[in-house]
Amino acid sequence: MAPSLWKGLVGIGLFALAHAAFSAAQHRSYMRLTEKEDESLPIDIVLQTLLAFAVTCYGIVHIAGEFKDMDATSELKNKTFDTLRNHPSFYVFNHRGRVLFRPSDTANSSNQDALSSNTSLKLRKLESLRR
């Protein structure tokens, strides 16, 4: 059937659910005014709620389209073994490997630069404390 029919059915179901909720609220306020708060909802409001819920669910199921198989083999049969566990979104290129596996001559010079800047920073802190 046409998708607009199912969308219309969902719309009618939602409207009926809203009407049932409004009717229940109105019935409750009427019961408060008449001081009969221990009575339950009338059967017509309960039936309208259940029928509207069923109609809405039926329309939503038809709008959703075909369900996928619960068995994973239908999706896995199109994939090769190499692409099965390949998750490129988990690749990390910004990691400590650059520092650990850098040539030794650049590593030593950067360590010396870091040490000299560190000692000058400590000396500046000590000078500010003496004043």
Swiss-Prot record:
Residues 23-43 are lumenal. It is a multi-pass membrane protein. GO terms for biological process: copper ion transport; magnesium ion transport; protein insertion into ER membrane by stop-transfer membrane-anchor sequence; tail-anchored membrane protein insertion into ER membrane. The keyword Transmembrane helix applies. GO terms for molecular function: cobalt ion transmembrane transporter activity; ferrous iron transmembrane transporter activity; inorganic cation transmembrane transporter activity; magnesium ion transmembrane transporter activity. Residues 1-3, 64-131 are cytoplasmic. Keywords: Endoplasmic reticulum, Endosome, Golgi apparatus, Magnesium, Membrane, Phosphoprotein, Transmembrane, Transmembrane helix, Transport. It is found in: Endoplasmic reticulum membrane; Golgi apparatus membrane; Early endosome membrane. The modification Phosphoserine is found at S120. InterPro entries: MMgT (IPR018937). The chain crosses the membrane at residues 4-22, 44-63. The keyword Transmembrane helix applies. GO terms for cellular component: early endosome; early endosome membrane; EMC complex; endoplasmic reticulum membrane; Golgi apparatus; Golgi membrane; membrane; plasma membrane. Part of the endoplasmic reticulum membrane protein complex (EMC) that enables the energy-independent insertion into endoplasmic reticulum membranes of newly synthesized membrane proteins. Preferentially accommodates proteins with transmembrane domains that are weakly hydrophobic or contain destabilizing features such as charged and aromatic residues. Involved in the cotranslational insertion of multi-pass membrane proteins in which stop-transfer membrane-anchor sequences become ER membrane spanning helices. Component of the ER membrane protein complex (EMC). Belongs to the membrane magnesium transporter (TC 1.A.67) family. This is ER membrane protein complex subunit 5. It comes from Homo sapiens (Human). The gene is MMGT1.
